[in-house]
């Protein structure tokens, strides 16, 4: 059965300052249970895990989101937990994890992929946004201000999505990693990590479903191809 990636909003809309909720948590969790996202007004980094939405706020506090809470951007799916488990050893940093994941993508880099990599992490370095007020700035401007967090000897899961390069603009190409600890007290967008051993599950995704915002901000966006703000936010 072909798996589907559900995406709320377009990445270049987020770059253009469309930070209002494209979808509610309730709506997103009707069609997905695992993934990554960003809160309305950039008020936190979202990790979807096991059918719940966890937001790492600008101060680092992790909370369970309410069904009515808004999501400015998300990429999520119904994750197949029956996927084979693969052991990864000697993960020195995020770059080495990406190198270990490369063979799984190289077979068909034109598809989408999502992973869950769990275990005890020697270190995790994350960030979360500072929320914005209207009129919203461009993402490149908002990305100049964020908060970083460092955790050691923490157990949890990294959830990450891979989008192929040809969908750049609509999606953010390559890997995008979020972390959530098992006790749901630590999280955020991953800047770096290390671990002696992780247990990896990977899902290959062959269908893409895009939900565009029905907001005033989105209607006013001048969407076009161009340089991604990703370079400014260390993704």
Q: Where are the predicted features?
A:
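Short helix/loop capping segments that flank catalytic or ligand/cofactor-binding pockets
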Residues: 56-57, 125-126, 168-169, 187-189, ...
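Compact, glycine/acidic-enriched structural inserts
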Residues: 78-89, 206-233
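Long, positively charged binding patches that form subdomain-scale interaction surfaces
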Residues: 99-161, 168-170
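Histidine-centered divalent-metal-coordination microenvironment in nucleic-acid enzymes
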Residues: 172-180
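A glycine-rich, hydrophobic loop/mini-helix early in the fold
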Residues: 56-108
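N-terminal low-complexity or amphipathic/hydrophobic leaders
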Residues: 13-78
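A hydrophobic, small-residue-rich beta->alpha segment in the mid-to-C-terminal subdomain
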Residues: 181-224
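Hydrophobic, proline/glycine-rich low-complexity stretches
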Residues: 1-11
């Amino acid at each position: 059965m072909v798996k589907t990636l559900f995406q709320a909003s377009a990445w270049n809309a987020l770059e253009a300052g469309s930070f209002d909720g494209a979808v509610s948590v309730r709506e997103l969790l009707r069609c997905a249970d695992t993934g990554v996202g960003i809160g309305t007004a950039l008020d936190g980094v979202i990790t979807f895990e096991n059918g719940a939405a966890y937001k790492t706020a600008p101060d680092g506090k992790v909370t369970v989101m309410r069904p009515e809470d808004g999501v400015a951007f998300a990429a999520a799916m119904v994750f197949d937990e029956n996927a084979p488990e693969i052991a990864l050893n000697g993960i020195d940093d995020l770059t080495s994890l990406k190198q270990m994941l490369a063979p799984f993508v190289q077979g068909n880099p034109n598809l989408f992929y999502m992973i869950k990599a769990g275990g005890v992490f020697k270190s995790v370095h994350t960030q979360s946004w500072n929320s914005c007020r209207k009129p919203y700035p461009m993402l490149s401007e908002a990305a100049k201000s964020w908060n970083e967090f460092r955790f050691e000897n923490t157990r949890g899961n990294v959830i990450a999505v891979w989008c192929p390069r040809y969908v750049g603009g609509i999606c953010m190409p390559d890997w995008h990693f979020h972390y959530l600890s098992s006790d749901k007290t630590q999280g955020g967008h991953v800047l770096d990590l290390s671990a002696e051993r992780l247990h990896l599950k990977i899902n290959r995704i062959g269908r893409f479903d895009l939900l565009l915002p029905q907001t005033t901000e989105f209607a006013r966006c001048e969407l076009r191809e161009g340089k991604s703000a990703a370079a400014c936010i260390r993704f």
